[in-house]
Amino acid sequence: VSTSAPNDRAFFGHPAGLGWLAFCELWERFSYYGMQALLVLYLTNYLFLPQNIGHVAGIDAVRGAIEGVTGPRSPQQLASVVFGLYAGFVYLTPLFGGLLADRVLGRTKTVVTGAVLMATGHFLMAFEASFFFALLCLLIGVGCFKGNIAAQVGDLYAPGDKRRASAFQIFMLAVQVAVILAPIVCGTLGEKVAWHWGFGAAGVGMVIGLFVYLKGRRHLPPEPRRDRAAEKAAAVPRTPMTGTEKGRLVLLVALIPVLMMTVVGNQQYNNAFPLWSQKYMDLVLFGWQVPVTWLQAIDAAASTAAMVGSIAFWRWWATRRREPDEITKMALGSLIAAAAPALLVIASGIVDHSSEKVGFGWAIGYAVLNDIGFANVMPVGLALYSRTSPHKLEGLMMGTYYLHLFLANTFVGWLAGFLETMPGQQFWGLHAVLVGGAGVVLLAVKLVFGKLLAPTAVDNGQAAAPGSGDAVPAH
């Protein structure tokens, strides 16, 4: 419960703490997305090349473990698997960070610990030998930081304070600014100057974020002490789940592999797509070679526009026709997203027949189609799981929902290995089939289980709002 005064409106009508938290999050996300934009390119084009890979401490053990599952990997294939594992575990570690904050350290100490670990990890990326230790620091740091700083935003507001929703919109706007700027700044330094300059810029961003957080701590509400005896005495006896709740629970868990497939094209944007673009796309603009990492800035801008446009579209639609339910929106989103890799099937055909690189517009087309689809899958799915999960398991089920991103990233890391051995038309065609097939499965789920998922009076909150949901960065 917040201890902030209701009349605290120092930051655009919100508590001053929101400004500090949003600015801190901007720099943390700048460091994260700046490093992510460079990672697969750095591994493929430099660190995992035969003349350099021997410098990496622990590479024999890591490579042996990966190749024990996948078979021998080329530098690009190994880079894609490592990137996929890193990007996947980013969605698991916040579960443990939340437990650490709730039961041991408290949110503030956990956030500071996470920021220090991430800054350390970014600077360790400057040394080839410490690469895997750097990734470990980053993963643990993200786990400590990510969920807990968002929880502190909620702590600024008393229950029922109507400013809470717009507070998270402001918070997410800071994230979107970082997602756009990070690939431009860190990517340009990494590709045009030296890889370590890009990683160093990400580290500087994290240090700034830590300084901002420490400076703004006095504006955050104090954390209440937990009275375990009182909590135990006040505990309400658990009631058994109803048949509807059990059915929904089974269905929501069973949907995770389907949701994994819906975002395969989206998650590939940071893995195989920059590698494909580097080889087959003409990135010269007005005589200047545009860094490949800038494609991610284009995608971030398209993602922001798609999220806002989707919300506006469904609000407009609801004034004229009956609005579709969440599953239908997600199915439509998947089918739209499938058009993005399908577009690259055409581009790959042009490359194969003309032996010339394709233009910049194909990257923009991929980003726009993918992000329109993603805007109707990811946040809408979040709303579906929030509404239909059994109330006493809502927190667990929200964590379970993010499991599909862990699975998608690890799967995409393996799938990206086929980029070297499979013709481009087949490679991107496979992605289009996987994403489109998931959309068809979601339509089937709607037909068979529509009544089970339909809104009821006992749902958690209301049915999904138009275009629902929180702004979620595309990658």
Label for each model-derived stretch:
Residues 116-133, 334-355:
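C-terminal ends and interior cores of transmembrane alpha-helices
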